[in-house]
Amino acid sequence: MGILFEVLKQDSRTRARLGRLTTPHGVVETPVFMPVGTQATVKTMTPEEVRDLGARIILSNTYHLYLRPGHELVREAGGLHRFMHWNGPILTDSGGFQVFSLAPLRKLSDEGVEFRSHIDGSRHFFTPEKVVAVQEALGSDIAMVLDECAPYPCSYKDARTATERTTRWAARARAAWNSDGATALFGIIQGSVYRDLREESTRALVDLDFPGYGIGGLSVGEPKPLMYEALEWVIPLIPEDRPRYLMGVGSPDCLFEGIARGVDMFDCVLPTRMARHGAVFTHTGRLVVRNAPNARDFGPLDPGCTCYTCRHFSRAYVHHLLRAGEVLGIRLTTIHNLHFLLDLARRIREAIAEDRFHSLKEQFLAACLTPA
């Protein structure tokens, strides 16, 4: 199966739980936030820096690596871990979301999806089987099935079509997957914001007996209460001994709300994307460091933060770097944002272990005036 997941502690007031995910490249404590390294790199960071910030598992992207440099080249290099000098676990998403959001002129059928590269316009065809083979060539610890992510808003008819196709694709991916190999394969639950579709999707994928389950099709524009409601529909239907992964979600408030409902794994480009646009997480909410009021603020980005940036540099200095277009400005905001989320996940794990998750959640959200 490639992985082993154990629940170590269940919170007494919520569905939050402390877990241990054992993979061929190391052990990961959950709940966990996974930094995103789309192109086999967490933007502006070395692998050692990412690990020193507390990351134990990262995410990379099948669509992008398939197009450039190519999965066969990565295989020749000894696999993705060796290629990018990351010795911890790697999860690769299937590329389905990118095909539907980035690739122009795509054609969808039950067989798979034909698309043109957003890089050079070349024509490609993804099937459920091919996507599994590509991820096995990359050497991922955890691979994701090809799915069809319905947009929001989406009609019930279109959502049903996408959900049923995702289930059929999942069965084909499951059959193609080498379950005796080192790569574990997760199914992806779809269904948009429709309860019956979400529940049908979950039950069908559980019947296929995947090692873990992604919850997809959320954080695509729907109001957050709808996302939280969808989690409440599906999580009770997932076996307790399987990890639950909320895909593409990673703001601090969503971490708390997802974990409270039983989510174990999160990923999101938000910390690195915000950093590139001059914004950072703080304990009172989002701060846009690029904005003029920070030009003469000689305090840290977030008082009390212990990251490298906050220990050495002021808001005024980081503001200056960002305004001047210096790469160091983006590096410093990236370091801070990744530290913020990784340290928050660590604090949440400690709180669950000590059965005080609910109070930590209430305190954090009460202080957060401007959620990301």
From Swiss-Prot:
<feature type="binding site">
    <location>
        <position position="305"/>
    </location>
    <ligand>
        <name>Zn(2+)</name>
    </ligand>
</feature>
<protein>
    <recommendedName>
        <fullName>Queuine tRNA-ribosyltransferase</fullName>
        <ecNumber>2.4.2.29</ecNumber>
    </recommendedName>
</protein>
<dbReference type="Pfam" id="PF01702">
    <property type="entry name" value="TGT"/>
</dbReference>
<feature type="region of interest" description="RNA binding">
    <location>
        <begin position="248"/>
        <end position="254"/>
    </location>
</feature>
<keyword id="KW-0479">Metal-binding</keyword>
<feature type="binding site">
    <location>
        <position position="336"/>
    </location>
    <ligand>
        <name>Zn(2+)</name>
    </ligand>
</feature>
<feature type="binding site">
    <location>
        <position position="147"/>
    </location>
    <ligand>
        <name>substrate</name>
    </ligand>
</feature>
<dbReference type="GO" id="GO:0008479">
    <property type="term" value="F:tRNA-guanosine(34) queuine transglycosylase activity"/>
</dbReference>
<comment type="similarity">
    <text>Belongs to the queuine tRNA-ribosyltransferase family.</text>
</comment>
<keyword id="KW-0328">Glycosyltransferase</keyword>
<comment type="subunit">
    <text>Homodimer. Within each dimer, one monomer is responsible for RNA recognition and catalysis, while the other monomer binds to the replacement base PreQ1.</text>
</comment>
<feature type="active site" description="Proton acceptor">
    <location>
        <position position="93"/>
    </location>
</feature>
<keyword id="KW-0671">Queuosine biosynthesis</keyword>
<dbReference type="InterPro" id="IPR050076">
    <property type="entry name" value="ArchSynthase1/Queuine_TRR"/>
</dbReference>
<feature type="binding site">
    <location>
        <begin position="93"/>
        <end position="97"/>
    </location>
    <ligand>
        <name>substrate</name>
    </ligand>
</feature>
<dbReference type="GO" id="GO:0008616">
    <property type="term" value="P:queuosine biosynthetic process"/>
</dbReference>
<feature type="region of interest" description="RNA binding; important for wobble base 34 recognition">
    <location>
        <begin position="272"/>
        <end position="276"/>
    </location>
</feature>
<feature type="binding site">
    <location>
        <position position="310"/>
    </location>
    <ligand>
        <name>Zn(2+)</name>
    </ligand>
</feature>
<comment type="function">
    <text>Catalyzes the base-exchange of a guanine (G) residue with the queuine precursor 7-aminomethyl-7-deazaguanine (PreQ1) at position 34 (anticodon wobble position) in tRNAs with GU(N) anticodons (tRNA-Asp, -Asn, -His and -Tyr). Catalysis occurs through a double-displacement mechanism. The nucleophile active site attacks the C1' of nucleotide 34 to detach the guanine base from the RNA, forming a covalent enzyme-RNA intermediate. The proton acceptor active site deprotonates the incoming PreQ1, allowing a nucleophilic attack on the C1' of the ribose to form the product.</text>
</comment>
<dbReference type="GO" id="GO:0002099">
    <property type="term" value="P:tRNA wobble guanine modification"/>
</dbReference>
<dbReference type="InterPro" id="IPR004803">
    <property type="entry name" value="TGT"/>
</dbReference>
<feature type="binding site">
    <location>
        <position position="217"/>
    </location>
    <ligand>
        <name>substrate</name>
    </ligand>
</feature>
<keyword id="KW-0819">tRNA processing</keyword>
<feature type="binding site">
    <location>
        <position position="307"/>
    </location>
    <ligand>
        <name>Zn(2+)</name>
    </ligand>
</feature>
<dbReference type="InterPro" id="IPR036511">
    <property type="entry name" value="TGT-like_sf"/>
</dbReference>
<feature type="active site" description="Nucleophile">
    <location>
        <position position="267"/>
    </location>
</feature>
<dbReference type="GO" id="GO:0101030">
    <property type="term" value="P:tRNA-guanine transglycosylation"/>
</dbReference>
<keyword id="KW-0862">Zinc</keyword>
<dbReference type="GO" id="GO:0005829">
    <property type="term" value="C:cytosol"/>
</dbReference>
<keyword id="KW-0808">Transferase</keyword>
<dbReference type="InterPro" id="IPR002616">
    <property type="entry name" value="tRNA_ribo_trans-like"/>
</dbReference>
<comment type="pathway">
    <text>tRNA modification; tRNA-queuosine biosynthesis.</text>
</comment>
<dbReference type="GO" id="GO:0046872">
    <property type="term" value="F:metal ion binding"/>
</dbReference>
<feature type="binding site">
    <location>
        <position position="190"/>
    </location>
    <ligand>
        <name>substrate</name>
    </ligand>
</feature>
